Amino acid sequence: MSQTNPARALPLNSTVKTKTPLSPQAVADMAECRAALREGSYTFFAASLLLPQAVREPASALYAFCRLADDAVDNAAQGGNDKHAAVAGLRARLDAAYSGEAHPSQAAAVDRALAAVVAHFEIPRTLLDALLEGFGWDADGRQYQSLEDLQAYAARVAGTVGAMMALLMGVRSSEGLARACDLGVAMQLSNIARDVGEDARMGRLYLPQQWLREASIDPQTWLAKPVFNAGIASVVQRLLDVAQGLYQQVGAGVAQLPLACRPGINAARYLYAEIGHEVARRGLDSVTQRAVVPRARKVWLLAGALINLMPQQAAQAAPCLPANRFLVDAASFTSHDLSHLDSPSPDATPWWQINQRMANGAVWVIEPFERLEGQEQMAPIPINRSPP
């Protein structure tokens, strides 16, 4: 049976200019998204506390869907089921969300919340289709010959998330969107550099195979028996260098964000860049060990994220990463006026009040990063099987 269009039934008071209260259904749906993330993706839940509510609420709906999509593909693989069928099921849920009809799935609350967010913020379907395309590449067991091939994958599974987060923050400029996608790709490359051994033991190889051959490593022979050596170290270093270059470019995009949004994005930027630094400190060996950023350093980085709200100098514009171009074009294009959309005002909260509010919870926010290190990807998001 068809349900009420969630885009109308879920007036998200955190993102609209009117003071219309949330409907009971909206309250229940958003509460379920937040609860799911708190249990299944505590790192995101904690980091999201550094974002203003106007971004945190819709971001929770988007991220809950992203995690559910990831879990659906992983669970299909673990259960011996067809991963491609899982991706097809996710596309059906997107069809429902973009048509304004919640999909009759086990996660109806997330579907309804997603439908409301994509309608209210006019998030192009191209972005979520690209995300699912990346999951489809994982389902194929695809490996990547060149850096450009790997960046195309990272653009789909992470650059898309950066673009959507930018839209939630009111960013529609090509430059701002390009930097948001850069951050997503950089974070994905950091994860890949950190998880080389863990991925290999699960039969996955993300390192560019051209780079491996240039280091005198046969990719498939190494994958059959992954070992750390000087060749692997050189490839990991090259990947970290690429990621670091992208992190440095992101500053131009952060400067375009509303003031209240900058601490959360800076936190992600600093913490993920530090993963690469920690890999380097450990001799670039991400085969026999998994780099973990010490808690004290996380606190220091978070403090920097809270303080560095204003750009220290004008960042030089950089060209859009070719792998991200289609995302930027899709997200920046609009055929009509978007002035009805609300975005967090950069002047809504004085910077000193933002710092005080964030600093009060900074140490608590760090704790989940430490406890969940290395465990988050294994924790499925629990969602009630029937809508509330």
Predicted regions and their residues:
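Catalytic cores of Mg2+-dependent Asp-rich isoprenoid enzymes
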Residues: 2-186, 193, 198-388
